[in-house]
């Protein structure tokens, strides 16, 4: 278990650096003479036509709907493993990160709505600061090396996974529109097929892949966000085969490098390019970026700490071994690193609104996430013992 966590964290730390490079490159291109090339590249029409099936979208939507579905497949595999065998497999292990994650979603959403109350357009972005970017958060923590107790790393990992699960539910309930009955019926049949494969003990990934592709297309056409197909597929792939092998973990290990070093950097590059040349102080202090930035910088740590404290005081949860509140507090600050997950929700929340709102949301996400990363890193560095960095 500990070896798996260490391998996960080492990969996430490298991935976090690559994400930063992708974000910096996107911002550089969006605010330079290369801006036209950048926007033109993301707007490139890509069409897939097979018989009556016709999917025609700009490249950025293929990234957000297609590549991110694979990312959510990986999240689903991680969540299933942790629920059945890992850090969330018992009530005692799952209680504290669960309460922390709930607080870390509710309070930032409340902060955002406080600044955007009464505006039906901007209110749609309430879930943006509720997300935590697991790659960035774990990557920042990994920079502190062996000074960080494994139990603290497991706490952040479990919290982030529950947060991801919450984001999945939010997307399903609040960001699905114009539902197509026929597509939903096809999706339901595909899900029934996937469940049937699981019940029959099929361990070959090929039939899951075929039905999964059908499910993705059906969900894409249904009005429900296509990334949810990845989660459903993940939950249907068996964790253990009769011979003791794990099809689920095998796929997870295969997908993880692709997600860390390709999918998330590509997503960050495609979505982080905010043109700031036409922005001024009035823009920066408008409700959307302020609500998101403060939701991430203040709402996240306050929500995580308050809900955790209440849970421990009511004896509904307990602190990890060898970890006190002075270590939990900076980790709570790190949970405000929203980056790719917050940007993804922003792309859904303002998909049909003026593009300006998307730019403002990304700007708020960048400011809030960077501040949360800096505060979390230096705070945690200060409270940890100075040994073997």
UniProtKB/Swiss-Prot annotation:
Keyword annotations of the record: Antiport, Cell inner membrane, Cell membrane, Ion transport, Membrane, Sodium, Sodium transport, Transmembrane, Transmembrane helix, Transport
Catalytic activity, as annotated: Na(+)(in) + 2 H(+)(out) = Na(+)(out) + 2 H(+)(in)
Range of residues in the leader sequence: none
GO cellular component, one term: plasma membrane
Record-level Gene Ontology MF annotations: sodium:proton antiporter activity
Family: Belongs to the NhaA Na(+)/H(+) (TC 2.A.33) antiporter family.
Cited function: Na(+)/H(+) antiporter that extrudes sodium in exchange for external protons.
Name under which the protein is recorded: Na(+)/H(+) antiporter NhaA
Gene designation per UniProt: nhaA
